[in-house]
């Protein structure tokens, strides 16, 4: 082809060869003489070849595409064929099936037709009769089993005689299938797991009979009611009664006959009715027999022959049996005849089973209860419990059906077991109310009485549980009171006191609660068994019950709290159980409810989580014994109740009348606070140590007897504030810590100081004097731990924190950190606690008023501290404090004050400050507590403090002002409670008493009045100022503290300083006086009196604490500042806190005024004083509370003994410098990790702290005496409390290890400190 093609192509050779494609042959020929033309031809050839190839490829591609399309089309057709076959197959299958059936039916029909054609009409009727009768019987059975017959004229039985024909008309109400059919058990419940049929096994056999019985029961009830109404209406007319009874029977008969006849023929019905009417005068048996024998004879026969018809007859018989029985009541012989009559019995056949069970009365009761009976079975088990308790519990639990379970699982362990057994016995009954249908009737008979109770206890099976609870007193108080009080939780004020009485009675019962631990553990296990019920109970008992418990448990716990703090029990008494009672009544509603919501979940958890709760309680109790008791009891309720009993015994011994309850309430709150503190300690291991120290400290605080009386008002306020702060403050754990610390500080002045630091809300005096205790608690933990602790507590008591910081330079860093926390907590404590307390009860209002004042006073103290902002400026907290300086409101420099004191230990404390800055980080705890406090701070603090201050100060000013000598502790405590309601109160109550009595008596009354008035205004301002706090936690706390201090200065003798310069100027004057060592000593003394003075009245205290804390705190800071200001200029702060522009003399006079005006400030300064009490305990000489005396003496000396105090205070300051270092070292011990030296000092100072505290108190007399005094006084004051104190120490140990393994060393030190603190404060108090 190639050749041919080129050959063929050659002819057109005329065409240029290079313009046409060459053939292969041509190319070969010209290969030897290749030319450009050959190239062109080759190119053309190649191009043509390429085009051909491409075209061929396209063609092939098209062909392939066509093939693919064909294949797809073929595939589609194939599928269509498949579908067609499938459709055909299905269609044929269906058609075949239908066709077969049709064919068969047709064949049958044809055969039947043929047969029928053969039969006559009569034969057809005869054949149909059985079928019709069977259908009628089935219908009647359905009506009987599935419907309840309602008689329209049931109420008009008399008029029914005339309208007998109309009775044929029936109203059918479908039955509730689940009345007879119990629901399955709760998934996961014990019965559910144990029984294979999960509660549904019996139904298959019983369902039909039960259903029919059920229907007959309902019908019989209706008939009974009708008959009864007929009988009563026409009781005299036997014919009427018979007629009416017949009517009702006729009604049933007509119903059966009607339906049977409706299916059959109306003629039969008419005949039956006519025959029945004619026979109505006769007995029911005759009538029924006649009617049944009449047209229905076939039906009756078939009913007898057929089981189903027979059943219908039985149902009818039973139906009539109630009517007959009723009629029998009217006519006994007919009843026998009716029952004997098989036809009549067949009419009542529904109740044939019930005949034995029910006479009409029983049956009617049963049926009335039948609806109840379903729940009644639950009551059957519950019946034993007193209905009143169930009544209370029902509202409290408010858990509808499951309430009983909740109570069963939660409220009783053993009771719950019993109830579970009962539930198992009555499986249907176990479902909230649904009992087994048979059980229902049996239960109805048994529970007819129970049903009455049942409805009350039905929801609260705990009623039984309650009964068992007395045995399981834990639950009785815990859940019974919880739910009872929950119902009464709102009126918690009354409820709390009532619950206190209950708690006492329960505590008497609770003493057996040693048994209760097992029950509690059982309850825990049972709760575990029923996680759902457990959760529900926890939800209700923790939340609702938490409130109820907070009311009831707190009320009952107050005694337990007293037991918690053996020292605190007495201290509660000391601080005034009246105030405690007020708190109890008011606190339980608000603070208890709130505190216990946070607390009680743990309390409830104590049963569920015994170790945590117990740990918290043991720490909160500050008594290892009590903690162990509670653990053994397995529930804090038992422990709280036992402790409450012990505490009540002690309290009654100490405070006997009002103070016993108050002490109980206070300490119940203290418990809560401790509990929360425990939580906080869980959050912060250092806090755990602090909590231990706090708890150990409380025993120390308790010893001062004189302080107790004065403190008693304060303690209630303290605790009300504590609980209120606990409740109101978003940071309940922190508040609780503060409260715990406060509760423990109450034990003794040394404890007060230690507790103050533990509280962390008492940064200045608390950290200074309480620094050792805080250090004890946080000594093994790092200074951060102490600071975190302080912060946690500080959140409760921001002002106290500031004070503490000012008081001890070591604490200053903590104070800085605590500032934010305390500031946050302070507002919360004041606003939340005060407002809620005020809202909840007058007592709380009164107590809270002092508390509010305490908070305000504490704030003022802090404000005074902020005056020494420059002092804090030196510290790392300088930022916080510098902010305080920059912000007038930030006179929060009270924290700087604390920093001044801390600054006084600048070498270590500057580190401590930095470490406290680390504590700021550690303030994770703070932030956790602080953040809630912050949020509450502005709104709750300003609004609540304003409301509370306005209300409470008025209430407390008169009562607390008179208390100044004895109430100063309360006032001081109240002052500190503003930031740390409970702990500050307690601590300061101890130190303030002496000072308030000595230095603040004459000054307290006048100064308090002015200060309180000013404090109210100033506090409001302070709140406003505190809110704008620039820094997160510290600056807010510092600002608020400084603002509060400014306000306080404006309010009271501190007002002499000027409110605006009080912080800056006040601090400057304080610094100036402090610069002079003598002046510093006197100022320190003055600060102590201020604190002591404010302690005088809770209201005055808080106000004075505000006004006085400036001077008092500043003075106090400068007292310790005298020691420190030399090193850091803390003195200038104290001078400033004494009075903005006051000279040492002016400061002393102002301080005395403040001590008078600021018993709260003394208390607030009490933190400083607490630290001073650790250092200038000379004040302690004068009063049972050396710290208070120190403050008081300091104030008095500042005025009268200014030089003495300068020398003594200076010496105290020197020892305080050491002591403060020691105290602060203890605080630093909390901060210790950052400062090993401080920690060592803390170790040495732990004993020294007690010694220093003793010395401080001794400085009032003699510093060395202070130590012995504290030890001796604490012991003598609280012999019972000494045990509690030691147990508190033990608890502190237990809680410390629990909280932190890292705190082991610090725990040991803290324990030693705690014991020392207890010994010293006890001795000091006892000596005084």
Swiss-Prot record:
CC annotations in GO: cytosol; early endosome; early endosome membrane; endosome; plasma membrane; WASH complex
GO MF term set: phosphatidylinositol phosphate binding; phosphatidylinositol-3,4,5-trisphosphate binding; phosphatidylinositol-3,4-bisphosphate binding; phosphatidylinositol-3,5-bisphosphate binding; phosphatidylinositol-3-phosphate binding; phosphatidylinositol-4,5-bisphosphate binding; phosphatidylinositol-4-phosphate binding; phosphatidylinositol-5-phosphate binding
Stated name of the protein: WASH complex subunit 2
Gene that specifies this protein: Washc2
A Gene Ontology BP annotation from the UniProt entry: endocytic recycling
Region annotation Sufficient for interaction with WASHC3, WASHC4 and WASHC5: where it falls in the sequence: 1-219
Motif (LFa 6): 655-667
Location of the motif LFa 10: 871-881
Phosphoserine found at: 157, 159, 204-205, 209, 283, 384, 387, 531, 536, 610-611, 720, 744, 749, 780, 795, 867, 870, 1042, 1060, 1077, 1102, 1162, 1165, 1327
Species: Rattus norvegicus (Rat)
Region (Disordered): 201-655, 675-830, 863-940, 991-1088, 1115-1210, 1289-1310
Span(s) of short sequence motif LFa 12: 1157-1171
